[in-house]
Regions:
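Selective recognition of hydrophobic, aromatic-rich stretches within alpha-helical transmembrane segments
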Residues: 27-50, 111-150, 182-219
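Selected alpha-helical membrane-embedding segments in polytopic membrane proteins
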Residues: 32-93, 97
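Membrane-interface interhelical connector segments
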Residues: 99-112, 151
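Short helix-capping/hinge motifs at transmembrane helix termini and TM-loop junctions
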Residues: 92-95, 99, 103, 143, ...
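Small-residue hotspots
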Residues: 23, 84-87, 91-95, 116, ...
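Membrane-interface segments at the starts/ends of alpha-helical transmembrane spans
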Residues: 17-18, 22, 106-120
Length: 220
C-alpha cells in the first residue's frame, strides 16, 4: 500500500480544490449534506478499488444516488458500532443501580469504579476490532452496491486475519489523518474544519480501497 499517496492523490485531480471546497460546504447542510458526503466518499472508495487514475467523482452529479448510498453506508457503520453503543449503555446503567442497592458510599464508589473500568477496557477492545473490520465492510459494499456484502463476516474476518498488519497501519494512519484535520482546521479559524475533515474522509477512502485491494486475493 502507498500510504503517502493516500494524502497526495487528491491534489492530482485538476479540480481538487473546487471539489474539496464544495464538499466541505455541502457537509454544512444538516443530515442531507452529511449523507451526501458519505455517498461521495463511498464513490471515491469504489473508484480507488477499481483502480481509476483520478478517483475523485464530480461534485453534484447524481445527488440523489449519492444521498441514498450515504444513508446505507451510515446504516452499515451504525450496525458495526452497535455493540460499542450497547456496552456504553450498560456501563452507564450500572451507576444508579449500585447506588440504589449499596448503602456504603465508599463501597459504591469502588464497585462503580471497577464496573466502569471493566466496561471501559472492553469498549476499547471492541472499538479497535470495529475499526479494523470497517474498511472491509465499507469496501465490499462500495465494490458491489449490495448492502448484504458488508455483513459477510466470514469473508471480512478472513481478510482481516490475513492482513492484520496492514489493517492496523490503516487504522493508525486514519486516526492521524483525523487528528491532522482537527489541528489544521482549528488553525484556519475553525471554519477550516469542514474542509479538512472532508479531505481526511477522502484520505480514508483511499486507505480503505488500497487495503481492500491488497486483501481481496486472500478470500475465495
Amino acid at each position: 500500500m502507498d500510504i503517502g499517496r493516500s494524502f497526495a492523490y487528491i491534489t492530482e485531480d485538476q479540480e481538487w480544490w473546487k471539489k474539496v471546497l464544495l464538499g466541505g460546504l455541502i457537509s454544512l447542510i444538516p443530515i442531507v449534506g452529511q449523507l451526501y458526503v458519505l455517498g461521495y466518499v463511498l464513490e471515491t472508495l469504489k473508484n480507488v478499488i477499481a483502480g481509476r487514475e483520478v478517483p475523485l467523482p464530480e461534485i453534484g452529479d447524481d445527488f440523489g444516488g449519492k444521498l441514498i448510498k450515504g444513508l446505507l453506508l451510515w446504516v452499515i457503520t451504525f450496525v458495526y458500532f452497535l455493540p460499542l453503543t450497547l456496552l456504553s449503555t450498560c456501563s452507564g446503567v450500572g451507576s444508579p443501580i449500585f447506588t440504589e442497592i449499596i448503602d456504603d458510599p465508599d463501597a459504591v464508589g469502588a464497585v462503580i469504579g471497577v464496573w466502569s473500568g471493566c466496561f471501559g477496557c472492553l469498549s476499547l477492545v471492541v472499538g479497535i476490532v470495529v475499526g479494523l473490520l470497517l474498511p472491509f465492510a465499507w469496501s465490499k459494499y462500495a465494490e458491489t452496491d449490495q448492502l448484504g456484502e458488508a455483513f459477510k463476516l466470514g469473508q471480512i474476518f478472513g481478510m482481516l486475519k490475513n492482513n492484520i498488519g496492514p489493517a492496523i497501519i490503516v487504522l493508525l494512519v486514519n486516526g492521524l489523518a483525523g487528528l491532522a484535520a482537527m489541528i489544521v482546521g482549528s488553525i484556519l479559524c475553525g471554519i477550516g474544519l469542514i474542509f479538512t475533515f472532508f479531505y481526511a474522509q477522502l484520505v480514508t477512502a483511499f486507505l480503505y480501497g488500497a487495503l481492500y485491494n491488497k486483501a481481496k486475493a486472500t478470500v475465495l
